[in-house]
Each structure stands twice: as C-alpha cells, then as structure tokens.
C-alpha cells in the first residue's frame, strides 16, 4: 500500500476520533492490513492511564516497559506479527528542550534515504486539534541510523518507520515517538491513531 495513503488514513483515524465520530469506510486501507490488525484493535480490555496531564486509552496488547532513559515518562513495546521481525517501540517524552520543529527535525535526521535525499523532505507532517489540544503528527520511512544522542551508537536499520505525534497540553508538550520496522509500525498504525485521537486532558 502506498505510504502516502497510509499517512492519509492515519490522519483520518485520528481526526475522526478527535471530532467524536468513527471512520466507517476503511477502503483506503488494504484488506490484508485490516485483517492483520483487527484482533489488536477490537478489544474491550483497553486500559485508561494518566500520562502527565493527559488521559490515554492504551491498547491491551501494548507491553508497558520501564523507561530506558530518564527523559522518557512512559514506554511501550508493540509486538511484531512474527518472531523473525523486530517489535516496535513507543517512547513518550515531556519537558525536552527545543521547539516542536527542532525536535521533529532531529528525529528526521536519524534517518537516511536510499536516494540520498534529505529525510526532512520525505516526511509527511500535519496539524490538527485533539481534545482541544494542538497536535502535530509526522510519518517517515527510511534507514534508521541511531538514537540521535551525542554518545548513541550508530546503527543501520533499513526499512524502518517513524510515526510521531506532538501534543500541546496546558503546561507541557508531549512527544510520542513510535519507531520500528515498517511492517510492525504499519501493523499498529491504526491503533496508534486511535491512541492519539483519544487523548484528553485530565479532569480536575
């Protein structure tokens, strides 16, 4: 399925939930992708969790992990379809320095493209509202080359995909970074869209 259609479909899912109505026509997603993800999506066992000042509905098939860095406020492992494929990881940050654009550009720079072009030019970025909060989502594929920190180890992971969402809360900005093999991230793209679309401010 063309990557552009996947991104459009993801934005529809998030936007639909954010506006309080669900997408009924899923024709833009292939039947194969829908069948693979259906068991993951259709569950009454989702957990409601607080993430900073936000409430989130977490898919029950996502595995909560101890954050691997003090910069992360939460971390989840998203299982691959089979054991011979790597899992994906959702890392959630808050209170990190730099603007939204700065951080997105830093994440984009962690990828390189087969044709040698700048990854920033290949990324798809869109803004809209989720639960009254300004939200930016980004989608990029390519060869992942490392964590982006000064002491991080250089890697070469081909055919990787980044799905990112940045949500501006009342007092903090929340960064959601889903990273992994393109097939694994694609498997969870709709669930990620639902997760972001259902984010709300904590009621006081």
Can you annotate each of these PLM segments?
Residues 1-88, 95-133, 141-163, 167-204:
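N-terminal targeting sequences that direct proteins away from the cytosol to non-cytosolic compartments
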